[in-house]
Amino acid sequence: MELTCTSFSFPLLPFESSLRQIALLDIPNVDLGAHADGPHLQPAAIEENPRRQADLVTRAVDAAGLGIADLFPTFGEGFRDRPVNTPDASVRAANRGRFEAFVEFCRRAGCPGITLLPGVVWPDLGEESSFDLSRQALTELVEIGEGAGLRVSIEAHLESVVEQPELALALVEAVPGLRLTL
């Protein structure tokens, strides 16, 4: 187990200042948050130019004397917009494309893993079918991530397909290579 701090823990500070604050706390590694509604890294910018974003982040992280522990992105705005288990095939394809950019970003920035949100329960589909969509989508994304040498994890949360610890365990067991971020 390693102690990390999220880059968005200091949302009122610029990204570089946030990293310096984390370093001042003697926390050796940062979890990079990339959220459309977040204060620093933006998923769309990573997708547009993963190399440039990785270079910018690497310089800032190195200047602060930190390591990178993980990338924690969202595909859309919040956990309900473009969730991993969307039943819409075109949105799922867009998510896969964005994930591939996240993978390139991580490889270039020296980030060893990506933590994703596990998906939502779709009222029209119910819990079981929503869970199965998450299993299918995450199986594909884990294969992509592992193919690039990255760890892929989920963060269980309320209002998700893995709201209960037993469901989080079931999803991790159902998707070969998937891990759990606490």
Label each PLM-derived region with a short phrase.
Residues 49-51, 89-90, 123, 134-135, ...:
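Short alpha-helix boundary/capping motifs
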Residues 106-126, 148-154:
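Active-site groove signature of glycoside hydrolases
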Residues 9-11, 34-36, 74-77, 118-122, ...:
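Active-site-proximal loop/turn and secondary-structure-junction residues that shape catalytic pockets
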Residues 5, 96, 122-128:
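Short N-terminal helix-initiation segments at or just after the protein's N-terminus
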Residues 1-112, 139, 146:
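N-terminal pre-domain/capping segments
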Residues 1, 19, 23, 30, ...:
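Acidic/histidine-rich catalytic cores of soluble enzymes
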Residues 85-91, 123-129, 154-159:
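Surface-exposed cleft-lining segments at the edges of enzyme active sites
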